[in-house]
Amino acid sequence: MIKSFYIHNFKSIKNLTVDLAYNAEKAPNGYKKSDSHIFFQTGSKKSDRVVPVFAVYGANCSGKSTVLLAMSVLNKFAKGWGPVVLFKPNKLSNLSKEDDRTTFALEFYCNKKLYAITLTYNAKSILHEELKVDGEVLYCVDHSKITCLNESLSKFADDFSEILKENCVIAMNSHQVNMFLPIIRKFYPGISKDLVAVHNYLQNDIIILSEDQSLDEPLSYIECFNLLSKTYKGERANTAKKQALSDLVLTMNGLDFDISNLSITNSGIKTTHKSSEGKEVEFDFKNESEGARSLIQKLMLIMYALRVGKTIMIDDLDKSLHPLVACELVRMFKSKRLNPNNSQLICNLYNTEPLSEVLSSSETGVLSYSKKEGSVLTRVSQIKDLKSSDDLRYRYARGDFGGIPFPYI
């Protein structure tokens, strides 16, 4: 589960932190008996509480998609991509040459430990890479040299330095072009449970569905469906797929989408509707509404995340969807019944209905943009004059929190 994500000098962002820590002074009365997740308790301390949902509001071009893209870039580094194609600095800010670098710092909980991975890079090289576990440094690479290893890894210092030199650093200019983490995982796959946990988390435990396709093609419907069907363990492949389809249709019906059956194969998607006479009529998927097509893809990934406890980040969650449907998608992550594995949702929204229906101030951020400050994220719970009785939807629409456009023609 993500606790925070810090971004420096990336596209429209100069400095921004997405903070998912539950920051109310105390938990509400009766929260343990509530049907809804108020927070996830990831450790014994109050500081180990994180929210199940974080929704970001903001005007067009304020940088909402940039946050998801930044996470995609960190994911790409973990998969072996280099800095040349991943360096996307803020071109509108007056940053000094020394500050012409991007930094990502991700804090997340895994196996009841708090991990913090920090990566700084420019167009030519990875400048700094560091991994901490519960506040202690596991390893640190700075300007192409290993500067710190914890006690259990220090015995491999010479081997690690040689691996770094041979597999991550260009000899002629000493530029580090590959992240150290996946290389160590490759050469020493079982050397540290913490290294394995972090690498697996960065590669597999964060699902990103973004409108920005500059780095990746979006997941196809069949890829989304295969992810979902594989969560039905202990079943034969065909039986698992049938059960996944059945649950998908049932959930869509619960969201008031009138589809009686679905067929998802490599050759395409077919939907079935019942006629006025009760007969089943098959349709090609392209004939469905944009809302239905959008929902099916999102819903497959949401159901997958809920079944296995992943974190999912969705750009424009409410795109082409009725506000009440968008509310229910958010509510799925707050439901203890539907989300028993502590899955997290981070999403961008335009529709304000969830502010009245399902989102708390701790679960809401507002993004504003200016050329001087770049994209600035304000967490609603940190606004000084906010009262617990305030209507968040009304106050946001009125402009009290910023993050709204001021159109005039």
Residue ranges and their predicted role:
Residues 1-78, 271-404:
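Switch/communication elements of ASCE P-loop NTPase nucleotide-binding domains
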Residues 3-19, 77-299, 307:
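Phosphate-coordinating catalytic segments in nucleotide- and nucleic-acid-processing enzymes
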Residues 147-169, 230-231, 240, 320-332, ...:
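Short flexible/disordered coil segments
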Residues 158-191, 325-326, 332-337, 341-344, ...:
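Amphipathic, soluble alpha/beta structural segments
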Residues 243-263, 383-409:
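Acidic, Mg2+-coordinating catalytic modules of nucleic-acid enzymes
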